[in-house]
Amino acid sequence: MLSLEQYKTAKKYGFQDKTIRRLAQVDTLPVENYHAGFKMVDTCAAEFSANTPYFYSTYDGDNEAASFIAEKEAETAAKGEPKKKKVLVFGSGPIRIGQGIEFDYCSVHCVWTLKKNGCEAILVNNNPETVSTDFDTGDRLYFDPLNPESVDNIIATEKPDACVVQFGGQTAIKLAKHMDEIGLPILGTPADAIDEAEDRERFDELLERCNIPRAPGRTVFNLDEALAAAEEIGLPVLMRPSYVLGGQNMIVAYNKADIIEYMGVITEHVDMDHPVLLDKYIMGTECEVDAICDGENFLIPGIMEQVERTGVHSGDSICVYPAQHLTQDEIDTMVDYTGRFARELHVTGLVNVQYAVSHGRVYVIEVNPRSSRTVPYISKVTGVPMVDMAVRCCLGEKLTDMGYGTGLHPNAPYVAVKVPVFSFEKLHAVDTQFGPEMKSTGEVLGIAPNYHDALLKGLIGAGYTFKTPGPGSCCIFTVKDSDKPEFVDIAWKLKDMGYKLYGTSGTCAWLNKHMVPCNEVRNISGEAPNIVDLLQSGLVDYVFSTSAKGRDPRRDSVRLRRKAVELSIPCITAVDTAASLVDCLRSEHSLANIPLVDIATLYRGK
């Protein structure tokens, strides 16, 4: 039996109700709706009186936030000013791989627009390393976790009129259902539409209604169901838990062993209240669309194309605007499909749609009725203030009154390439191989009059080195069978530049068979001298390694890539990235002879 005193002590120590129930093995608590109070952060370290609207929750002492709010409301009433509409804005929480500063950008711009439109913006976030948690960004800031119980405490104190969940990434969007259950109005896309996009079965029904194709997929809860589903739809399959961010715990399974390994890991570490999703893996070009919707019309600032093909997380792929390799029919299809989603889901605000293009056919990968990590990028390079417009739509304005038109916005007169930045030297034992699980920790932007110059700028900004081959300079190749045909041309170009080529047994034999001179080198587990000795010689400029199977850090391919990272040798793990890098190497361009594009003065004359 849990006493009231024990319960209150547990709350003072920071335990949530659900944790207390589990540890005390009780179904009911001594008191319901025992809300926390809020203390003001002392930004002056007790040197003198501080009065900043920056609060943290506590079960010990008075509720300073309630007193602060009462004083402000009394001042407003005394001046005869109308009471402002209170809007709770949920931030993105701690920055981690998969959810970065891009979502904080969206939260901050949302707050600015709300304040500009006469609302009182109350921000909830618990990351001190962001702009959103600067004490003067919102009207008030609550430095508390983004979970239902903590949010309920804030709502009990603030009594807001509405909330915004679509600008804080997956962390904030998970609160939509709870907000709907407690009856707090959500500005923008309704909670049911968000669930319809996230829930596999409901999303499939949506696609049927809209007559939009997607890769066949299934929902599974255990290993037997996963194996049966994979056999039904055919290997390879993309496997991921539902309701995840950054492609977390996502893989491409090529055989039954991969499925067995994955399900063993996922059932141990992931809450199986949400199912695992299996999709037929479609090899093709991946594209991304961010759109602003007002419930009737929509505006697409631009279509982005990923350099790496499907199977590589969009956050780890080089992203190009405007798309370089799409036909007009494919572009028109994406615009049409995006409009269908916007209308059918009753989207108000932002929606992100990811597409795969294979053999001229456009497939939908997923739809996210929220902001995405590409919103700051596409806003900057097109001059379309997406978050500002989305918030105004949530407040009832129409796109047709905002001056940017509807449908697909005209392309900019330049090319912008977003290149991911990785921190593998700080992430020990992490395989550098690209895949559906996001690993990048940042990004840079390269802008130029044409694609190759913009790509070169982006790659240099991301830390790639462009070397002129010297005496004995060489490159190492160890690639999987499916990539070998495409690496023939890449290897030829490097050979033509003066590089000596080395390859592990299978890759070396393939290149020599196709008339590309290549020297065999023993793999990392072979007798010395082997590939490690070659890496340590100081002569290797680039490593091209796409051999990967499973997640075992003991595999030769994984150990090779880690060794390259330790020695600061560029290691390319995707054939598309390799082709782009080699084209830049051969162009002989540098930052000295690429013209500057000043986008600040090119926003359509603005």
Residue ranges and their predicted role:
Residues A228-L238:
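Acidic/histidine-enriched active-site and ligand-binding environments that engage anionic O-linkages
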Residues E198-E201, V244-Q248:
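Conserved A3 ("GATE") glycine/threonine-rich loop of ANL adenylate-forming enzymes
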Residues M1-N63:
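Non-catalytic accessory regions
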Residues D42-I212, F221-A228, I447-G605:
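ATP-binding N-terminal substructure of ATP-dependent carboxylate-amine bond-forming enzymes
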Residues I20, G234-P236, D258, R370, ...:
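Short alpha-helix boundary/capping motifs
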Residues M1-Q6, A10-D17, E71-K85, D104, ...:
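ATP-dependent carboxylate activation and anion-phosphoryl transfer catalytic cores
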Residues S92, P241, V367-P369:
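Residues immediately flanking
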